[in-house]
């Protein structure tokens, strides 16, 4: 007997909405941490590249400052704040979110869109590794101005701070995150005040607002101009965070925080540094900290260290979020995901990702030893991500917003040209360390492509060996050799219309069926979060069998037992103590010949070994899970 599919709403208390200004303050502490700490090193590195070891001139200062101000205006304000942030997927943003949005409307170009999304995600990890290293190093280096003899201790102190930061990740940041906004508000306020004070000493620097100075600088400085342009891009590293963190704070609070506070504070700080350097070019050694009087140096070093820790925390949390999305979208193997807060949806901790990030960050600090050396590796990953975002934004305009091709092209092409110019300038850094984020990006891209391809092969071979569920039910209904046992068996499967392998193996070896049998499919949708009234589909097949589909968004952590509780009002009496969950544990072997190149097959086999158990990932108690082994060759 087959009945109509029923939908159920999971009861959930709605959190009290935060006020607009509370969200804006929160965005200052999380979204703008990375871009807000760029004044520590951006102007210094840009002018160092421009002068190429020679004398620093007024023309260089005006030209570089002009490029920095207009880069902030065009890339952050016009491109991200006013355009890209419109391309949300149910309120969420980010590279993989953009990919999922396009996949839902561009099925014919699914593979191409997937490659763009995977490339953007892979490059983000390169940025996530460099940001904590360069941020903390640049802040701690300020101690050299306070105590020149402290130089030998900068590296170990920076590494100690970073180790401490990663060690406390498992505790969660909910308790201290409320302080991020106020602390960064103080940070931006101090930058604005110090910049204004120095600006008032030399108002002539305001002429740098004229874009002609920037254009003239590039036209007359050749190779040094391109190197300086690559360093100028350091002013906007972190701009992707505006889009990626949109789901946590909302579009409007992030936009208002940028226009009202962050952009003016950054502009004043850069102009103040420029004004100071016009009178004191010898201060290029560390123009940020030398904005402040001697008595304020030590407090500013500690405040800057706090700001860089906050910036690093934001990037680390972003890496966790991106990893969770990649796992849910089938781009990475399953990993343990721990929730560190019962109230904040974005508070998660992924142990394996945490330790891999820590090892990579410490390696960078040890290998490069200074923020100036690390600056050569910074920027390539971010520019690559921005190029990919521009390309995907074009397709959003055409396929989601239905804008005419001429309009979409006229808007995106200028941004894309600017992105490509910055990418070209940053590619000059490859031999000086820029190869590192590229290597990380290429490696992670290979990992994601391999996992996706191998998973498709496994799924296809699994379905090929299974039989139709209705045929199976019909065959056992006339069999008298099968014993029935009390309780409920839940069989996880990717295809609810075929008989799960775990069910066939259980019947083959144990010769029994449970009184109630549930064919359970856990689906990941192309939306960040599934509404509770669309979470669950329940379809009774007969008195002994039923089909259930549980839907999760790609930013949700699947909790199967919790979701099954919602079936009780429909007549499915879910009781954990009388329910057994049957899962297929696949042992992957490389076939000969294989459908994948040898290196890719070996990589997939090893990733499958590293993948966490399905019972752990779906929050199924170990004592209620039964794993049935099977071997598949790829």
Swiss-Prot record:
Pfam families: K_trans, K_trans_C. The lineage of its organism: Bacteria, Pseudomonadati, Pseudomonadota, Alphaproteobacteria, Hyphomicrobiales. It comes from Rhodopseudomonas palustris (strain ATCC BAA-98 / CGA009). It catalyses: K(+)(in) + H(+)(in) = K(+)(out) + H(+)(out). The keyword Transmembrane applies. Belongs to the HAK/KUP transporter (TC 2.A.72) family. It is a multi-pass membrane protein. InterPro entries: K+_transporter (IPR003855), K_trans_C (IPR053952), K_trans_N (IPR053951), Kup (IPR023051). GO terms for cellular component: plasma membrane. Its main location: membrane. Keywords: Cell inner membrane, Cell membrane, Ion transport, Membrane, Potassium, Potassium transport, Symport, Transmembrane, Transmembrane helix, Transport. It comes from the Bacteria. It is found in: Cell inner membrane. This is Probable potassium transport system protein Kup 2. The chain crosses the membrane at residues 20-40, 64-84, 110-130, 148-168, 174-194, 224-244, 258-278, 290-310, 348-368, 377-397, 405-425, 430-450. Signal peptide: none annotated. Transport of potassium into the cell. Likely operates as a K(+):H(+) symporter. One of its GO terms (molecular function) is symporter activity.
């Amino acid at each position: 007997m087959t009945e109509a599919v029923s939908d159920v709403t999971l009861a959930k208390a709605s959190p009290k909405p935060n006020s607009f200004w509370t969200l804006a303050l929160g965005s200052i502490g999380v979204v703008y941490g990375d871009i807000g700490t760029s004044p520590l090193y951006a102007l210094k590195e840009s002018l160092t590249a421009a002068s190429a070891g020679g004398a620093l001139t007024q023309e260089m200062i005006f030209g570089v400052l002009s490029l920095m101000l207009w880069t902030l205006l065009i890339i952050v304000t016009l491109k991200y704040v006013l355009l890209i942030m419109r391309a949300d997927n149910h309120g969420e943003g980010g590279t993989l979110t953009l990919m999922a949005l396009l996949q839902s409307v561009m099925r014919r170009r699914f593979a191409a869109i997937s490659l763009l999304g995977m490339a953007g995600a892979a490059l983000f990890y390169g940025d996530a590794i460099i940001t904590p290293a360069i941020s903390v190093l640049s802040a701690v280096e300020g101690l050299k101005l306070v105590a020149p003899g402290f130089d030998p201790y900068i590296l170990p102190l920076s590494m100690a701070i970073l180790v401490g930061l990663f060690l406390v990740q498992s505790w969660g940041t909910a308790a201290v995150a409320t302080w991020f906004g106020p602390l960064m508000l103080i940070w931006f306020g101090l930058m604005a005040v110090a910049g204004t004070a120095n600006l008032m000493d030399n108002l002539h620097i305001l002429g740098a607002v004229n874009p002609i100075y920037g254009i003239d600088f590039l036209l007359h400085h050749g190779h040094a101009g391109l190197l300086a342009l690559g360093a100028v891009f350091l002013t906007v590293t972190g701009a992707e965070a505006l889009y990626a963190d949109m789901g946590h704070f909302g579009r409007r609070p992030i936009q208002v925080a940028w226009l009202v506070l962050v952009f003016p504070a950054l502009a004043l700080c850069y102009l103040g540094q420029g004004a100071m350097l016009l009178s004191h070019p010898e201060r290029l050694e560390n123009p940020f900290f030398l904005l402040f009087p001697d008595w304020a140096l030590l407090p500013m070093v500690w405040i800057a260290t706090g700001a860089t820790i906050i910036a690093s925390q934001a990037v680390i949390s972003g890496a966790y979020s991106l990893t969770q999305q990649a796992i849910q979208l089938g781009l990475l193997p399953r990993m343990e995901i721990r929730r560190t807060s019962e109230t904040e949806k974005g508070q998660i901790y992924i142990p394996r990702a945490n330790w891999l990030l820590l090892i990579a960050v410490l390696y960078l600090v040890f290998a490069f030893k200074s923020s100036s050396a690390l600056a050569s590796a910074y920027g390539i990953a971010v520019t690559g991500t921005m190029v990919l975002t521009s390309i995907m934004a074009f397709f959003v305009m055409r396929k989601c917003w239905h804008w005419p091709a001429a309009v979409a092209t006229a808007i995106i092409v200028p941004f894309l040209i600017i992105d490509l110019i910055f990418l070209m300038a940053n590619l000059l850094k490859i031999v000086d360390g820029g190869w590192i984020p590229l290597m990380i990006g290429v490696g992670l891209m290979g990992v994601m492509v391999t996992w996706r391809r191998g998973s498709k092969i496994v799924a296809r071979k699994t379905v090929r060996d299974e039989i139709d569920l209705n045929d199976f039910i019909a065959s056992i209904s006339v069999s008298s050799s099968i014993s029935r046992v009390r309780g409920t068996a839940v069989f996880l499967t990717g295809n609810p219309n075929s008989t799960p392998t775990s069910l066939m193996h259980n019947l083959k070896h144990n010769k029994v069926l449970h009184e109630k049998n549930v064919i359970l499919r856990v689906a990941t949708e192309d939306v960040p979060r599934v509404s509770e009234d669309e979470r669950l589909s329940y379809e009774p097949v007969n008195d002994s069998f039923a089909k259930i589909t549980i839907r999760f968004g790609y930013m949700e952590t699947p909790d199967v037992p919790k979701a099954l509780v919602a079936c009780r009002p429909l007549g499915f009496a879910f009781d954990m103590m009388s329910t057994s969950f049957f899962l297929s544990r696949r042992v992957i072997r490389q076939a000969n010949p294989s459908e994948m190149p040898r290196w890719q097959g070996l990589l997939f086999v090893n990733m499958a070994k590293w993948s966490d158990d399905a019972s752990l990932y779906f929050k199924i108690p170990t004592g209620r899970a039964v794993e049935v082994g099977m071997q598949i060759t790829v």
